[in-house]
Amino acid sequence: MIILKDLAGGSHLPKNVFLDMVILSRKKLEDIPEERRHRLLASLKPKHIPKIWELTGTRYQDAKLAKQVASALLSMDVNSMPPEYWRCRTSKGPMPFSWLNDFRKAIFQGKDGSTYGRIILLSKLYGPLYFTVREVTEIISTEQPCDLVYEFGDGLLDLSEFPEGFPIPAKHPWPFNDHLVIYIRHAGPGVVVGQAWQEGNDLDQVPKKFCGEILMVKDYISSL
């Protein structure tokens, strides 16, 4: 069965073959029961994740694939839904941030109709790491295509209400307050892949990749 691991292993193939593999992989992902889909993370090595990012870039060559999304909340076109929870793994966490290699995220809709999220870490040093979700079409630094961006900002989300059990926002510590963003590509149902950048608040600051690429798989059975 071709799943993301097989897709990543085909990076030496021509781009038209990449696209065929992306289409087939998406169909295979649909065949995996939702409650078992998060197990994909355990089947992948960190080296596979950058290849998945690269290969999902071919999705934009197909008009139909380019419109497909990984989840309802990330479609940015819903009215009211409960939060979604995702399991995430990076290709390489920077030192001294190796604890960021595996984490969880939550996506939720605010009363204002916008979409937001937070990174959920085991470490309590960094508190609640909230972000805003926006639709974008390309990465600023590379001009590569993408679907969304997670913008961390200063962390002080001005919302009148948060999902039950969510902590009160707090000011982000460095480097999360240094215009940290994660660009997102839809990879398949319940699966997205991201690329994190520290773009910097200073105009003359050169953007740099933060923690490589990040594979994110929706967890259909977990909550906080």
Please identify what each model-predicted range represents.
Residues 1-224:
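Soluble ligand-binding/transfer domains with enclosed cavities or grooves
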